[in-house]
């Protein structure tokens, strides 16, 4: 069976993802390592304002956020969804945490993918597991210094 596609879109900002083929292969690899299959995945890179409106409309949260993930999958083994990422939040977070912008972006991207794979981050224990998985997939796939 051929690989399902991952699509990248931009809303309300100017942004270009470097090396989309490498990123796509990386995400496919992560999904396979989790014993799941990709059906369809859209990344939407956007502004704070665009994502804030989504946050209000769909989650009733009146806050800025770096990522919102929507799963459309019928089961947890078949991954289908959208991941919205605020480039402005990623940039601010990178400055706050004193890390490279691209490292923060790729971490946020894999964070969204992990949500689609069934990982949560509501409790401290879940957050620890999520961070551990993020680190494993960032390092194992040498994604940290990609740009």
UniProtKB/Swiss-Prot annotation:
Pfam family, one: YbeY
UniProt binding sites for Zn(2+): 111, 115, 121
A single cellular component GO annotation: cytoplasm
Cofactor requirement: Zn(2+)
EC code: 3.1.-.-
HAMAP family: Endoribonucl_YbeY
Protein name: Endoribonuclease YbeY
Species per Swiss-Prot/TrEMBL record: Amoebophilus asiaticus (strain 5a2)
């Amino acid at each position: 069976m051929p690989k399902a596609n991952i699509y990248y879109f931009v809303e309300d900002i100017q942004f270009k993802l470097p090396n989309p083929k490498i990123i796509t292969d990386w995400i496919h690899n992560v999904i396979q390592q989790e014993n799941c299959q990709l059906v369809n995945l859209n990344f939407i890179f956007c502004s704070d304002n665009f994502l804030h409106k989504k946050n209000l409309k769909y989650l009733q949260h009146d806050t800025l956020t770096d990522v919102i993930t929507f799963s459309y999958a019928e089961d947890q083994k078949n991954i289908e969804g959208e991941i919205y990422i605020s480039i402005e939040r990623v940039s601010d977070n990178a400055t706050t945490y004193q890390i490279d912008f691209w490292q923060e972006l790729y971490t946020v991207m894999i964070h969204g993918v992990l949500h689609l794979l069934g990982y949560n981050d509501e409790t401290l224990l879940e957050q620890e597991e999520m961070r551990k998985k993020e680190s494993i997939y960032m390092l194992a796939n040498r994604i940290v210094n990609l740009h």
